[in-house]
């Protein structure tokens, strides 16, 4: 959530309507004044959950000046973080900026951090707050184990795993969800529940009752001609793409296609990050379609790693990628679609999931 989004969420005036910017902000100010003067105290939520984005240096400091949390969660940073090109010192700068979120917490607060992320782990020794760690690593307070996908024939039904705490082991099933990153999200949620004295069983029951995939965030969709579309079109980064591709390795039976777009804002890490993605794609998919100039690097690396020329296709635009995909896909294929938001791969998802095709 950007700088303007946080105060809007706090006052509850965040629903954007189609109106000129001036009138929108006048409406927000009027709503805020009304809330201060007339709203009942019990009308405001007891717990407010805010996303603090670190697009550039200083973002977290600014957001903390608006609202300092009692619970801070750092889910992932990665060795090559998103928005790295906005930071003069690269990964180190991103770690330092995101670390401000948990460093601002006091002794009576709680930090929830991912034990699997090497960059996140560098922050642990500097945190003053009570710290709860989650992940697949041994020693995690909430540990993720036995991750796989449930299949019905050649169809992916969802993600299944176990959450292990000091006192219990709980099975979890997330229907219509693909990436194992969702397991981390659930584990983090259980940790946050613990910060509010909610036991793991009750927290998990509440999560499972309401958990649903969001468009562009690893939802499993029904595609044309009995295909399954893994919609990760909203954005892409090295860590997220690696997770998505590796998740494909637990799917057996159907042919796997990846439509991968540029990963943007990586700065000096751009070439190597795309090479690494191409090498991984060569091991994980049967057909690779790349979209964008940077994604060409993926295609070339996949070829260099032994992928057949007939299985690698290079495209400039999302429209070109769609045309190639429609020529090469077969009935029953599993198709991963992922790229940075500005590449526009959501249009490929929309076309491939049209009813009646």
Where are the model-predicted features located?
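Residue-level signal for inorganic ion chemistry
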Residues: 6, 51, 63, 75, ...
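A conserved, hydrophobic alpha-helical segment in the catalytic core
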Residues: 45, 66-79, 121, 172-213, ...
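ATP-dependent carboxylate-amine ligase
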Residues: 107, 126-130, 166-167, 188-357
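Extended acidic/charged loop-beta regions that coordinate divalent cations
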Residues: 31, 35-44, 52-82, 121-171, ...
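ATP-dependent carboxylate-amine ligase catalytic core
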Residues: 1-96, 180, 202
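Conserved C-terminal guanine-recognition region of P-loop GTPase G domains, centered on the G4
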Residues: 97-101
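Short, polar loop motifs at secondary-structure junctions
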Residues: 115-119, 136-137, 292-296, 342
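Short glycine-centered segments of the SAM/dcSAM-binding site in methyltransferase folds
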Residues: 71, 110, 334
